[in-house]
A protein has these predicted regions:
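Conserved nucleotide-sugar phosphate-binding/catalytic loop shared by glycosyltransferases and other
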Residues: 3-9, 31-76, 85, 160-162, ...
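Glycosyltransferases and closely related glycan-assembly transferases
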Residues: 26, 83-96, 104-119, 132-140
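Donor-nucleotide binding loops and adjacent catalytic segments primarily
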Residues: 42, 47, 51, 174-258, ...
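Active-site-proximal region of nucleotide-activated glycan assembly enzymes
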Residues: 43, 112-175
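Acidic donor-binding loop of glycosyltransferase active sites
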Residues: 93-95, 241, 253-268, 275-276
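C-terminal "capping" alpha-helix adjacent to the active site of nucleotide-linked donor transferases
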Residues: 304-330
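A short, well-ordered alpha-helix in the C-terminal region of glycosyltransferases
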Residues: 331-345
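C-terminal alpha-helical cap of glycosyltransferases
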Residues: 344-363
Length: 363
């Protein structure tokens, strides 16, 4: 398995797990050739080359909007199939791995038509549209939740997890980062982070929730770049440190819990490390995926779920949840164990093993 083609695009939830798998493949065999296929005008066109991987672009659009928009999108997807085929013919991959996003659909269809082994990865508990329509092209479908597996042909599904969990599980942390932030490692640290870009709505809510100290807890409040003003209310507070961005891998080993969104990558990292969390799903994502992701952890006793609309009506609900959840050592320990039971820290290695088998190799 020397040549791998990875199709992923649109959002970080598709792209970062794909990059994690690619990096693991290179660690196992530095001579591996990897080609990413994505959209020319989406974030993958910047992120993938910056990570050091080759990138080829297609022009595809999602099936959203008006009827005319959907027709145009369908035409773009059909036109992308022969172009994807030409890219595959030139690169000659041993296997194609699709991580979702509409751009993956024409790539998987082109690979299937050429009898190239295909692995599909579904990050969420509710399958994405692109993966649903191309499931028939896949030889193996990797899921992160049992519920997701129920939406695909049973004989193709394997519950292996998200490669980002492998990255998080192996993170050693950086105590210097902790010290530079002025956090006390002898006290519980709660990371508050609403995705890489932050959330102005949740920033406003957190200012109300943390307007006074919570006994026994200190908070690292990540506002997102461009939202630094949200931290001014906490100037001089030793229990709340505010930054626009933090490398989560550097601080995961030192935190006792998180208050965060419920994107697929975040969930994979939390469970791989056994970090208990209060999850506030983003209500702005397609298919309400984050709510269903969060529900899985809540039902497993690994997290608390609080909806944003509830907090808009009464922010004190979150403060009460913080005190009851993070303030109880017994509840926190139980949630951490339950989160770890859901984790798949070997996801990347397990996927690579199965990829070799699909290519006709052995474990």
């Amino acid at each position: 398995m020397k040549r791998i083609c990875i199709a992923a695009g649109g959002t970080g939830g598709h792209i970062y797990p794909a990059l994690a798998l690619a990096q693991s493949a290179m660690e196992q065999d530095p001579d591996t050739r990897i080609l990413f296929i994505g959209n020319a005008d989406r974030m993958e066109a910047r992120i993938v080359p910056e990570a050091g991987f080759d990138f080829a672009a297609l022009d595809t659009h999602g099936l959203e909007g008006s009827l005319l928009d959907k027709v145009k999108a369908a035409i773009s997807l059909m036109r992308a199939i022969p172009k994807a085929g030409a890219i595959l013919d030139e690169f000659r991959p041993d296997i194609v791995v699709g991580f979702g996003g509409y751009v993956s659909a024409p790539v998987l269809r082109a690979a299937h038509a050429r009898h190239i082994p295909v692995m599909m990865h579904e990050q969420n508990s509710i399958a994405g549209k692109a993966n649903k329509v191309t499931a028939g092209c896949a030889d193996e479908i990797v899921t992160c939740y049992e519920k997701a597996g129920e939406q695909f042909p049973a004989g193709k599904v394997k519950l292996l997890g998200n490669p980002r969990g492998s990255v998080a599980a192996s993170a050693a942390g950086d105590r210097q980062v902790l010290e530079s932030l002025g956090l006390d490692p002898s006290k519980k640290i709660i990371l508050v982070m609403m995705g890489s870009l932050g959330s102005t709505t949740m920033n406003d809510i957190m200012q109300q929730v943390l307007d006074r100290p919570v006994e026994g807890l200190q908070f690292l409040f990540v506002t997102g770049r461009g939202n630094e003003d949200a931290g001014r209310a906490f100037e001089g507070r030793p229990d709340v440190k505010v930054v626009p961005y933090v490398d989560t891998l550097a601080i995961y080993p030192f935190i006792s819990g998180m208050i965060c969104r419920a994107g697929a990558t975040t969930i994979a990292e939390l469970t791989a490390r056994g970090i208990p969390a209060i999850l506030v799903p983003s209500p702005y994502v397609a298919g309400n995926h984050q709510f269903y992701n969060a529900s899985v952890l809540k039902d497993a006793g690994a997290a608390q779920l609080v909806e944003e609309k509830t907090l808009l009506e009464n922010p004190e609900v979150l403060r009460d949840t913080i005190r009851g959840f993070f303030g109880s050592p017994m509840i926190l320990e139980s949630a951490a164990k339950n989160a770890a039971r859901l984790g798949k820290p070997q996801a990347a290695a397990d996927m690579l093993q199965d990829m070799r088998i699909l290519c006709g190799g052995s474990r």
